[in-house]
């Protein structure tokens, strides 16, 4: 079986969805920009030699519809002979895109693929066109379709206080801002054209979603966003709405070596698991455990974790049940997470994997695990190993 390696991993800056940097930039353009950039950074690979393009996107309608992956590849002027498909596993879409490409390579059906994902939450709102089947209420709680309420339920089940949530959210912004100031994101962010507050076209090379002024004291004044009476989850402890894309060049190890390309990481194992939709945010726990089992590892073997911060109330129970509460500052989301950077739904799986690989290189780590929850009760995880 072929070994799967990540040759390169990049992303756009994360733009605010409400009047942000990419308010006049389409999702296909963000995607095409990264496709072109990956190929430009790796000229040893002939674009015509790509076997497929797997691109995650959740809301596949409006500008994100009609197979966005193919539209973006055509905009990027990738040869017409290279196919492309848009993948949807809700929040896990771009990590699923990685898994799909990895399996193709493992079985010998492909040697080189572009993978990634995008979500323009400013142009295609999260609730656009959503209409759940009424019959689902027979076996799934209505609140299962309301992500904030699932986070509330999870926090109550696991004893996660408002104070714990506020502290974690403040940490996310502080870590992300420190990473920005130190240049830690420089190797993963590709400068991307957008418009500033005055409408002037400029190149953005930083995440505009981060709020460096965030404090626990300020967060403590916010009202609950989803359960106004007894709730603890606020807008400040939820992932920010943002627009962005992320991409990876994935190859068989043999093809990468043949082309003289240096692999940055190897895909050690992959897993997807279902869980109760009412506590959908718990999905990373069983998914991570299964991925670790497949890799022949335990949580203690993992040097660094990237866990998508859908909500502080969601990620803290996962950290707790993976036995990592005492290692947050040493191992988990060292450059902040989605609370600070935002969670462009179809982009986030590739984004956290990209950030993880860069962190692994910076910290000289051997093993890393990226994982995320998925709406309606799923979790997805990938174990990476430095080559």
UniProtKB/Swiss-Prot annotation:
Pathway: Lipid metabolism; fatty acid beta-oxidation
Catalytic activity entry: an acyl-CoA + acetyl-CoA = a 3-oxoacyl-CoA + CoA
Pfam families according to UniProt: Thiolase_C, Thiolase_N
UniProt keyword Chloroplast present: no
GO cellular component, one term: cytoplasm
GO biological process, one term: phenylacetate catabolic process
Keyword Lipid metabolism carried by entry: yes
EC number annotated for this UniProt entry: 2.3.1.16
TM region(s), chain numbering: none
Molecular functions (GO terms): acetyl-CoA C-acyltransferase activity
Main location: cytoplasm
Compartmental location: Cytoplasm
Active site, renumbered: 91 (acyl-thioester intermediate), 343 (proton acceptor), 373 (proton acceptor)
CDD domains linked: thiolase (cd00751)
Keywords assigned by UniProt, alphabetized: Acyltransferase, Cytoplasm, Fatty acid metabolism, Lipid degradation, Lipid metabolism, Transferase
Subunit structure, interactors included: Heterotetramer of two alpha chains (FadB) and two beta chains (FadA).
Function: Catalyzes the final step of fatty acid oxidation in which acetyl-CoA is released and the CoA ester of a fatty acid two carbons shorter is formed.
Family: Belongs to the thiolase-like superfamily. Thiolase family.
NCBIfam families associated with the record: AcCoA-C-Actrans, fadA, PRK08947.1
Record's protein name: 3-ketoacyl-CoA thiolase
Organism in which the protein naturally occurs: Enterobacter cloacae
Designated gene of the protein: fadA
């Amino acid at each position: 079986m072929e070994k799967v390696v990540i040759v390169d991993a990049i992303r756009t800056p994360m733009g605010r969805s409400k009047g942000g940097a990419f308010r006049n930039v389409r999702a296909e353009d963000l995607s095409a920009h990264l496709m072109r950039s990956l190929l430009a950074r790796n000229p040893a690979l002939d674009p015509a030699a790509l076997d497929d393009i797997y691109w995650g996107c959740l809301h596949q309608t409006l500008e994100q519809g009609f197979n966005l992956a193919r539209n973006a590849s055509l905009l990027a002027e990738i040869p017409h002979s290279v196919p492309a498909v848009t993948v949807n596993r809700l929040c896990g879409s771009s990590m699923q895109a990685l898994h799909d490409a990895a399996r193709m390579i493992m079985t010998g059906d492909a040697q080189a693929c572009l993978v990634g994902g995008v979500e323009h939450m400013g142009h295609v709102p999260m609730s656009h066109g959503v209409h759940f089947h009424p019959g689902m209420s027979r076996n799934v709680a209505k609140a299962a379709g309301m992500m904030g309420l699932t986070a509330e339920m999870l926090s109550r089940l696991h004893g996660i206080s408002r104070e714990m949530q506020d502290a974690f959210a403040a940490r996310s912004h502080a870590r992300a801002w420190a990473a920005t100031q130190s240049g830690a994101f420089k190797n993963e962010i590709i400068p991307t054209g957008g418009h500033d507050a005055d409408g002037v076209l400029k190149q953005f090379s930083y995440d505009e979603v981060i709020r460096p002024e965030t404090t626990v004291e300020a967060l403590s004044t916010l009202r609950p966003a989803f359960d106004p009476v007894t709730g603890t989850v606020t807008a400040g402890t939820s992932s920010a709405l943002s627009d962005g894309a992320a991409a990876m060049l994935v190859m068989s190890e043999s093809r990468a070596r043949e082309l003289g390309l240096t692999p940055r990481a190897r895909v050690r194992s992959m897993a997807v698991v279902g869980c109760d939709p009412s506590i959908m945010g718990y999905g990373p726990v069983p998914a991570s455990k299964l991925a670790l089992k497949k890799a022949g590892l335990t949580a203690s073997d993992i040097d660094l974790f990237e866990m998508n911060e859908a909500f502080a109330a969601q990620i803290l129970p996962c950290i707790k049940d993976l036995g990592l509460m005492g290692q947050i500052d040493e191992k988990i989301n060292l450059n902040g997470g989605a609370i600070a950077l935002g969670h462009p739904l179809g982009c986030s799986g590739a984004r956290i994997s990209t950030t993880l690989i860069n962190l692994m290189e910076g910290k000289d780590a051997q093993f890393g695990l990226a994982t995320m929850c998925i709406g309606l009760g799923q979790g997805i995880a990938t174990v990476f190993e430095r080559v």
